[in-house]
Amino acid sequence: MKTDDFDFSLPNELIAQLPLANRADSRMLYINSRQSDLRDAAFKDLPAYLKQGDVIVFNNTRVVKARLAGFKSTGGKVEVMIERILGTHQARALIRASHAPAIGSTLLLENAITVQVEAREQDIYTLRFIHSQPLIELLDQYGHTPLPPYIGRIATASDESRYQTVFAQETGAVAAPTAGLHFDETMLTTLQTLGIKIAWVTLHVGAGTFQPVRVENINQHIMHTEQYHIPTETIEIIRRCKAGGGSVLAVGTTSLRALEASALIGDGELVAGSNETNLFITPGFQFRVVDRLLTNFHLPRSTLLMLVSAFAGIETIRHAYQHAVNNHYRFFSYGDAMLIEGDSRS
């Protein structure tokens, strides 16, 4: 299958640059893949599509302030985007500079942090932070909110809260699980009042989520790896839901990938505990856990667009995205949502 099959034209003005004043005011495009049903709705309508006994699974990862600016020892400017935290003083990162820093060289970030460049693998550097404070504390003190590259502005103080879900708990992501950004406390309370069960997973979203697929044949793409955790309680909630005839709604592609990666390891059964995954979901994938998906609109030629095409069907997603463009939906991280009733057909 070709990467070109997942390309589409998107006017720049449809890329949301700012969040809405209220989280839950987004629009929502409802897609029933099995019935070829496409419906314009509001995110606040979500409870009407669920029933008592259904489960909604959230990713409770917390975004760290992963962007740092500074200088090379030669004086050239650098911008560092943490891709993954490896330990107390070590991380993998993307580095933007006029000339790539040499292995063994040092960087001075935010006029406070000395960093040694230890290794490089393609575009990813391994960095060691030479400081008495743990890396997590340094990022919280000196870092900046890692807004995606398609948001063409500098992060503001409001982004610290708005580019974070209201239920964020487990620190480690360098990008937000954006489908979760639509939920406010009122919506969470409403869902629970209606008897909708809430379950949690953790998947620490890496910067690789924004990378386009650069190969012509999607089967040649090398997927980035992310860490995830599935609690035993979540598995029990999902088992009871399935046994009672309920459906499982994954909030975001990250929640879906964590669940489906776990089920793949367990030969159809969810496996509790922590692991990492480079699962690349493309059309033809057999979904074992998730029945419904709430997700934002994704970038052309991206692995996430391929994932939703696998979940809903390629032609269904093409039609839905064209409808969204024609009707001026807002795209990407701060944009609107889609609620998809799954279809394993490719």
Curated annotation (Swiss-Prot):
Keyword S-adenosyl-L-methionine included in the entry's annotation: yes
Reactions it catalyzes: 7-aminomethyl-7-carbaguanosine(34) in tRNA + S-adenosyl-L-methionine = epoxyqueuosine(34) in tRNA + adenine + L-methionine + 2 H(+)
Pfam families referenced in this protein's UniProt entry, alphabetically: Queuosine_synth
Keyword entries, A-Z: Cytoplasm, Queuosine biosynthesis, S-adenosyl-L-methionine, Transferase
Location relative to the cell: Cytoplasm
Main location: cytoplasm
GO biological process, one term: tRNA wobble guanine modification
Enzyme Commission code(s) on record: 2.4.99.17
Entry-linked InterPro entries: QueA (IPR003699), QueA_dom1 (IPR042118), QueA_dom2 (IPR042119), QueA_sf (IPR036100)
MF terms in GO: S-adenosylmethionine:tRNA ribosyltransferase-isomerase activity
Pathways per UniProt: tRNA modification; tRNA-queuosine biosynthesis
GO annotations of cellular component type: cytoplasm
Subunit structure: Monomer.
Role played: Transfers and isomerizes the ribose moiety from AdoMet to the 7-aminomethyl group of 7-deazaguanine (preQ1-tRNA) to give epoxyqueuosine (oQ-tRNA).
Protein family membership: Belongs to the QueA family.
Protein name: S-adenosylmethionine:tRNA ribosyltransferase-isomerase
Lineage: Bacteria, Pseudomonadati, Pseudomonadota, Betaproteobacteria, Nitrosomonadales
